[in-house]
Amino acid sequence: MEPLLFNSGKANPSQDVFIDVEVGDITTKYGSTNTGSFSSMDTVEAQAIKAETARFMEVPQGRHLGVFSTVVLFVSRIMGSGIFAVPSVILLNTGGNKLIYFAIWVFSAAIAFAGLYLFLEFGSWIPKSGGRKNFLERSFERPRLLISVVFSCYSVLTGYALTGSIVFGKYVLSAFGVTDDSWSKYVSISFIIFAVLIHGVSVRHGVFIQNALGGLKLIMIVLMCFAGLYTLFFYKSTGQVAWDLPVTQVEKDSLLSVSSIATAFISSFFCFSGWDTVHTVTSEIKNPVKTLKVSGPLSLIICFVCYTMMNVAYLKVLTYEEIVSAGPLVGSVLFTKLFGPRVGGKFIAFSIAISAASNILVVIYSISRVNQEIFKEGYLPFSIHMSKNWPFDAPLPSISLCGFITIAWILILPKEGESFNYLVSMDGYGNQFFLLLVAIGLFIWRFKHKNEVPEIRASTFGVLAIITLSLYMLMAPFFADPSLNRVGFLPPYQIMSLLVIVACFFFWLVKFVLLPKFFHYKLLPKITYLHDGLIVTEWVKKPCLC
């Protein structure tokens, strides 16, 4: 068999890679040879080739994200809707106990830093777009393709910008004084369509608008910090607020339990969840290892300071009952009480809507890149079409899928106010499951490469803390009253997350194990060059006596 030649697009011919594996036919339609990554293959040799070629392969979009753009991506993803909506459910699940409330926020920040350095170390080993998808499939290579297919399917099915969209719709209506909450869904859907078109038509213009909204968000962060300082030193409440209660007091008839603390942590950790987002677009970052080493910790520090100031403001201005009853609109209630209905209720609500809009743009941008990497692997139907940078040299198909799934969830969700909390918990539970696997995978990777030193190294204690905490977070919801973890006709959030993961497992089992075994064929990867230089994989059937 003739070896296959992959040209790296470099002037040095020594960087050409010859692949001596059976992969099927290669298309002869070549475009730019600054190619993206290609999939996991059928042999150990192909995996080695993949690791070798990943060093110099580039995406067609090029490296255009510097430190500022990366900080904007981090901050915009982290600070979306969470701090304006989640404090209500956290205070409720901690029983109004301020000591536990602030301890959860501090602990969440510490785990976020540990998780950030976990990803920074993995990212220094594997500096390419895909994030945890790449980390998992390089760590868990057996059973063949299991982790790749399961995580890929799960990521596509849960690839939505939902929580930010819900908050955006609610706060836009609040800013314009609309009391009919049924319109919030249509506002959310309209902006999702706008975001899909912006990123799907032009990468450059999409990033420009994203950076502009991110800049406004940074200004908002400064204003929020000043609001926290103002309430701490100058604001005088007219009655007893949550801040005035004893620090260890638990409210009567509270829901405080092991399970409720786990739910509170999931909600709090959700507010920091964007620390792993930028690794999904590593191939578009200039000098990714050094850039992420600076922008990652800086972004988390900025967000933690802002969160602390905002939490002080909530407790200094509002009562326990006001915070809990406000739900996702707790941010609007705070600023209305601070600055009056005209400034606080309108202007601040509009500002929060801008923050949520920035978050939506970043989430859709990041998810579309993950989806594109997944479709390039060829596991799912229509992968060739969904992975294309078409028709405007931007991944419109994968962006559109993210928008479609988000809109579908918005339409399906019940109207109850608990829908937001349910989504946060469901999304957080699934992410916690895969974060556990990534943390375990780092130790596997270190063992395989024990003679090599990464450019960035995560704390072993921090990684062990993530593993321990993740196990606790995954088990705790099963010890609670199931009715507390569900909404409408949907099952408890942890069951919903696990059902999606199990469905992804059965997809792998049927397509890559059972059907080939029963019908006597094996699946081999056929590598295809797209017109823009992307390398994608198709899985073709080859008869065998297996």
Curated annotation (Swiss-Prot):
Organism source for this protein? Answer: Saccharomyces cerevisiae (strain ATCC 204508 / S288c) (Baker's yeast)
Q: What GO terms in the biological process aspect are recorded for it?
A: amino acid transmembrane transport; methionine import across plasma membrane
Q: Which residues lie on this side of the membrane: Extracellular?
A: 1-70, 120-148, 210-213, 276-297, 341-346, 415-423, 481-494
Give the transmembrane ranges: 71-91, 99-119, 149-169, 189-209, 214-234, 255-275, 298-318, 320-340, 347-367, 394-414, 424-444, 460-480, 495-515
Protein name (database record): Low-affinity methionine permease
Q: Does the keyword Membrane apply?
A: yes
Q: Which GO terms describe its cellular component?
A: fungal-type vacuole; membrane
Q: Which family does it belong to?
A: To yeast high affinity methionine permease (MUP1).
Its lineage opens with: Eukaryota, Fungi, Dikarya, Ascomycota, Saccharomycotina
Query: Gene encoding this chain?
Result: MUP3
